[in-house]
């Protein structure tokens, strides 16, 4: 069987920005991640071994000179030594992985080790599982490249004609690397055509979160951070201070760059109650990844106004399992309120004829700040009950504490 991940940078930008943040703030931290399949999929017999073979192959995948040159040129907020010394020397270590499969076919995947190292596994695990399943269940054999390009092209025209500012964030649950590349080609071509037809009076293609494909296509690369930074910080400084402390530490590391903050890890109230004007000014916007988008827009706009900030100077990035129709609804709601943009994943990169996308994630479940300290459970609550992940006892405890604080 073909190898699925063949490029070191076939990963999302936030993996690298978070990795550098970790090296600066928690270089000795250790973490454990767990794979969650929200559909409780029963995988084919032997899938665990096939997946392990795919992931062990990554031990031979290293960053190339071309990739280092691209990252050095494109990401000035990442220092030269990080890209050209640290990443050059980085090697995937499959000993960090534990992969098992029960008699019913359910997968149990754990990643455990130094945080700066284990963070690299999330995207490869998810994209390998997704593509491997589409190969094994026959979806890949039925795939019609010309037809799927045409469908993506028409989607693109709809996006740009409706005025959406949008980029691809579909690495983790994509149909395949080749399909993600084909989708990006279609988005580029449709954007160029609509832009020409309208003299630029249309939406905007903001690029892709995938570093490798941004390099191949010479387009912008999107991404800032992930929930795990806040989830880990909670075990250090508590649920009421973790958002502020990550904002402060992130701004110390990046000095105003990569400034979209993902605020919903423990719900919206605890974030907005502790958002200072300095932090709101430092970050260029907020990413909405859960909750009812219109309600979240109202909360964000009101908070900015309370702080004396014009919301139209700030950005709201929407990324909560969107399709194009839903993005258009949100866009119309945002007009005159806040500057909006969209990151769309599965609906672009796994919306393939007669194919059911996976509903899978890899999340941080435990952490400790050094190898000599005790382990603590790491959880994520979000603004959607369906997205709550982690140790149930801790989730219940934090929810009770937050509910009591809001009374």
Model region roles, listed by residue range:
Residues 1-246, 251-252, 361-407:
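Ordered alpha/beta subdomains of enzyme catalytic regions
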Residues 2, 217-407:
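Glycine-rich phosphate/ribose-binding loops and adjacent secondary-structure elements
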């Amino acid at each position: 069987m073909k190898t699925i991940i063949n490029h070191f940078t076939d990963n999302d930008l936030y993996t690298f920005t978070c990795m550098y943040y970790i090296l600066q703030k928690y270089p000795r931290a250790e973490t454990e991640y767990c794979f969650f399949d929200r559909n409780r999929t029963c995988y084919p017999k032997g899938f665990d071994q096939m997946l392990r073979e795919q992931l062990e192959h990554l031990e031979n995948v290293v960053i190339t000179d071309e990739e280092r040159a691209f990252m050095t040129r494109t990401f000035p907020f990442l220092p030269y030594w990080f890209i050209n010394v640290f990443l050059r020397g980085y090697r995937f270590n499959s000993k960090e992985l534990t992969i098992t499969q029960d008699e019913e076919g359910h997968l149990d995947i754990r990643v455990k080790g130094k945080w700066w190292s284990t963070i690299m596994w999330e995207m490869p695990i998810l994209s390998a599982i997704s593509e491997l399943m589409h190969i094994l269940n026959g979806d890949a054999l039925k795939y019609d490249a010309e037809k799927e390009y045409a469908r993506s092209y028409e989607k693109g025209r709809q996006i740009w004609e409706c005025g959406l500012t949008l980029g691809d964030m579909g690495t983790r649950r994509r149909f395949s690397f080749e399909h993600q590349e084909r989708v990006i080609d279609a988005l580029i071509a449709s954007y160029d055509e609509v832009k020409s037809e309208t003299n630029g009076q249309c939406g905007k293609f903001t690029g892709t979160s995938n570093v490798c494909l941004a390099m191949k296509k010479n387009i912008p690369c999107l991404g800032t951070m992930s929930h795990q930074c806040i989830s880990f910080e909670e075990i250090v400084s508590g649920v009421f201070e973790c958002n502020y402390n990550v904002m402060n530490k992130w701004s110390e590391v990046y000095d105003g760059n990569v400034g979209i903050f993902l605020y919903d890890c423990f719900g919206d109230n605890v974030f907005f109650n502790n958002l200072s004007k300095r932090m709101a000014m430092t970050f260029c916007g907020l990413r909405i990844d859960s909750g009812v988008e219109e309600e979240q827009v109202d909360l964000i706009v009101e908070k900015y106004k309370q702080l004396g900030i014009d919301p139209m100077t700030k950005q709201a990035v929407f990324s909560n399992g969107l399709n194009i129709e839903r993005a258009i609804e949100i866009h119309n709601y945002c007009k005159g309120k806040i500057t909006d943009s969209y990151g769309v994943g599965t609906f672009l990169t796994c919306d393939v004829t007669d194919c059911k996308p996976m509903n899978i994630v890899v999340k941080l479940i435990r952490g400790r700040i050094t190898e000599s300290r005790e382990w603590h459970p790491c959880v994520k609550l979000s603004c959607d009950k369906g997205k709550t992940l982690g140790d149930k006892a801790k989730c219940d405890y934090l929810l009770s504490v937050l509910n009591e604080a809001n009374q």
